[in-house]
């Protein structure tokens, strides 16, 4: 037993060790390398096959092995690898060598020195064989590419410790493989030589010298193979000719044009081997902002020199290099592959092209948390620099610390830091206790200012010190006034600066004071010493060698874009002078640098390339004509129309001819549909970098690599489409079986599909043919000339000769000739020359470059030879649907002179000349036949009649004879009976007996046989017939006997047997018959019953199904009708506006409801009779339907819907979300009760379930303080109890506007310090609520000033009337759906993927009169409102779109519910955005939600669907709400013209802390008064540039009227994508029209052609009805012109991180508690800490903004120091009780991820303890965004995707055991 386990265990471990050992892996890799066959094998085999002697064989093998050994050594030795692996090595070595070798083989006498008698090793040929094999082994292989193996090596070399052992073992493995391979080759060759069958082959025997010839020509065969290899390599190498150097963007130009530059990736897929060392060398980051250095090695050397020595030096070193050395090294081994990369892949329109050779991941060891770990995002530059230092510093000075010492040191330093911070914090707190002023104790923030008195500071938004390190980016695109207010710059400084690298990485802390003193100031004044703040953090991080540190990011300089005016800056720069570290005070460079966040600098190419399209755009605008650098798709420019006008020549005489020519041509671009894999490649770049691809199809969507052949579905040899073959069989089988019978509609659909497939197939074939003509050289010229020849031949030779022949024939047959008609038809035929695509030009005009681009010849009214004219006239009056045949009265000419309906289509069948003749002959023959057959028919009928009569007569005679015979028989019988009747009367006669017996037998037999017949149907027809015959004969006999008896036994005494009377017999017989019949029928019924049942069930099922389908339709119809009626009723009530008591509204509603149901039912019935039901279900959302149901208590109490809601399966009609929620309404406990009408009813409880952490999504995304919040606070505090009248409203409005103006200044663009303070206060309070969660019993973070669950309103004054919605729903979270703000805020939302262009609208609706969005109706225009003077339909001015309707009278709410005020959501509805729209409405409409925000819940969804397609005058009824009774004359509209709004967008988009271009309506509201007057002036330029589209102007450079116009142009271009949708509006009919127009324009008298083309239906009149000046508005309305927003990249900053982290927070039951009284009680009941919070909460509600409690003591410290303290507290958490509470929870195995948490039951009371622990563990004593910082500085994670990883899994590592 022991032996067994010992053996088994050891064997396994031994096997594992052997398999994982370096030697085995090396052997395996070496063996694999054997199969990587390259050109060297060719020479090795040549030496064997040619039998040139053993010396040559040995030298070949030796050279081969030596070459392979060199390759293996190159794996280990990086310089050799780099030399051999570069593609340019192939350029230099391979091609000349191959060519030389090729010629050497062909012309041996040039190099043949003759055989020498000396030592064979000195023989030149043997040496050459050795060299060949050696050198060829170094080249790239091409059967198994070495790059695949190289990647394997790279992976293993990174893991492997003993690299030399690996190289050796891999070489040995290769050697073994090679020996085996060569042995196998030798055996094969030996077998071929020895095999007799090959020699005795008939072919070889017939030519006895063939074998010797083959042997002699072997050298020639090898040289041919060598030539093939040459060609193969030629395709892979970069061109050795020096290509044009790309135009580099200079530093200033690059910075200037950066706004429009294109951010691209460069795909480099060279097949070189990259080792780790190569990566280290090549992936070094670009040290400067401008990547130009990498372009030129000279420059690189120079800058390195400058950086290392810290001074500016002369270029001394350069003199030591010879010029050709530099040039050669650059040409051959430059990393950038000479001039250019391979491919551009466009991403964005912001920056230069990214260089993707720079690896995103760089592995290196780093010291983190006192332990050495591998960091995968280590800066490569830091690594190389550290290696340089290590080389230069002697080894004795560096001592290696043990891991334990490192860890202890880390712990100690952390403790020290924490101790120092805590002491400082304590000191500050003590000072506060002693009564010091709070402002003195508070740690002050460092400001960035340009004078000592801090009078001129930067605005807070732009201050890099105030905004935190990860938010300190400089915003782009400032307008002039803001910039002037914020800072004054005298010159436009655009220099480059280098920071001393050594100083940055190894800072000397003692020099800090000196370092600060030596910094020069911005604008030649001292910068505040506080600049130390940012540099301090840099040095600390450098000291701790944080892996994610990247000092080169410091040299990033803000870019700027120069527009027409020279002085306008697009960017604000924060500049200060460079660092001085030289003792002589000489600056490194006296230029400015910009500080930006420390991050990875993306290396970029120093030039940008454009493609043809961009070049065309640039040409149109600026007239620049640079050659495009990127290859575009294959295309041909086809000129379809040239505009020749005398007047233009006079106007454009000043211009050059080429310009005017260009402007006057209208051309189409025809793209080739062929696979074009050169597309997007950079012209002149290396093709060697492309992967090996094979293109085997005519049209191949993607490039296929042979590597993935096995993945491709269809192989070449057997591509059997089994499913395709099965389909027809299945279809036939299903058609026959009655169970699988398909309906007619399905069959039609299938036919339609097949037809479409066929058409598609034909079209593909046509395209294939056209592309084939395009690809073959000179094919177009040949085809064109053939077409022209065929055209002439047809028109002038074939057709005239046919006409002559026909008419001569007619004359010979004595008929009138038709010369005139035929010649008229012949003249009518026109041969129109067309472009290759089929655009018609004219009969005489050929398309431009038709010999190269191709030509089509279209035949209009093709001549058709007919034997006589006028024969086809009858077809005109047929069914109009069949006229389609007549319509196509044209064709295209093929190369062979045939006719085809479409270019390159299959030739159509031409009508035969003789067919009508044969038809006519047939008709005549039929007439003759008809007459002949009539005669025959008559004769036939006569003969038939004669036969019939004779037959009848014969039959009659026979009958008479038979009758006589029967009478005679009967008489004989009667005689016998009369003689013996009295004696034998009582006995039954013999025949009677027999018959009875036989009858019994037959009955029995039939009874036995029948069941057998029922069960199986196997009785033959014959048997059945016999049986039937026998029964009938028996029946006849019985009847006859009965009759005889009746006749004979007339006397009573003869009746001896009393029961056998004749009547009884008859009755029994009839009963028997009935019984038998019933038996038969029941049996048949039983047999067929199952089919009846089945059929019956199916009918019932179908009926039920149809009923259920109709239910939602009927319901929807009812609600539609009721909605309309109730709106009408309510409007009527408002109009009358009297105080009379009407009917009780609820009853009225009920009556109205019932009447509408009846009415709509009748309508439905009528519709059912006439046509199918049609209801627009999109009118109402399901939520609204359920709401209406909940209001109607009778419906609920009857529980009609309970079964639907309780059904747990997939309900076909109700969305799951709504179904789940609605179950709350129909609670089964309250089954027999009426629904309570109390304030907290079930409906409201149900609504409470809809929350997003009880904050709307908008709220989470924007928890930072915004201007609107402060503004609304101020607005609220103005109001008092009597503020419902007009005056207070006016006052409020004025103050509101005044406040906005005040806030608009650039200096005060941030909220005041108090507001800032309040913001931090709220944050900290929120975090403290989390921390102290376990002390509070069940309360959630109710009391925080954010008012998360309490007053979700903004803090109000006690006197302020709160919005009605708070009362209506018992304070439930309406804000989950509607944002809190009253002015619509379209600020940053993390869910927005698009730039919200809907809010721009600018000139889009230019000519549409849209009634205000405040007017609402479900679709009817009610004009009676105008009677009472209520201006319901206030039209927006032609240019005005956005304005707000501010109501001046807000009446207290009435108690009765309004129809449309459901859920109380109409309070201030037009201002509230819907943040969670997707939860109830269909997600398709979410994109339109900006417009919808203004009037949510009431706008019929139909209007959203028909956004631009509605009527030109959309008018809607006024929003009528019980909460707001508004008189129209008291409305004031703050209107903003759309262009003005656009201008505002440009002015203000940089003020907001969001992406550039994300506009905000509030900015418009702020500036509306100032800009009201400019509206008319500003709209002109927009119209001018966009409303008109003029071909001639497009080519000229556009002169901007103003900078604003240019800015607008730039803005539109950059953030919006404009595209035309051609498929719909510019459809085939339109294109057909255009083709006809092209022809008509060229004709002198186009009338006839025009009329005929209209008759043929080729030119459609309805399409012709186009406005002369199509405005942009109409194009948009029709859906032709589409404006899409460019996708924005959202900056995932602190708010978003907070949103993400809170997303996994756990849900608690008590969260649903919403009663304010309960909450206030809770404030008092909690401990003192919560009490103070309650005070604070109440203080906020009281609106006392001047008083703040310093509740959160940490506010004394600055945020950065606060963060440091908290992080240190967290990691030295031994003092806290967090871990001690529940150590089990902190077991690493027990830590669950967020998914597990969310999968648990929603009610987490069962897991409360662990929840608390999780929260404490997740939220230690630091703010939410500190998590991001911790990730950045402690866990080396910069990426958000790894954020959750650290949050959930990494914390337990730091627990104190």
From Swiss-Prot:
Subunit structure as annotated in this protein's UniProt entry: Part of the Tic complex.
Any one GO BP annotation for this protein: protein transport
Keywords assigned: Chloroplast, Membrane, Plastid, Plastid inner membrane, Protein transport, Transmembrane, Transmembrane helix, Transport
Biological role stated in the UniProt entry: Involved in protein precursor import into chloroplasts. May be part of an intermediate translocation complex acting as a protein-conducting channel at the inner envelope.
Flavoprotein listed as a keyword: no
Transmembrane segments: 18-38, 64-84, 87-107, 124-144, 172-192, 221-241
Pfam annotation, one family: Ycf1
Sequence segments annotated as region (Disordered): 246-304, 612-631, 740-764, 1547-1579
Localization of this protein: Plastid, Chloroplast inner membrane
Name the record gives this protein: Protein TIC 214
UniProt xrefs under InterPro entries: TIC214
Gene Ontology cellular-component annotations: chloroplast inner membrane
Composition bias, Acidic residues: 256-268, 281-304, 612-625
Recorded family membership: Belongs to the TIC214 family.
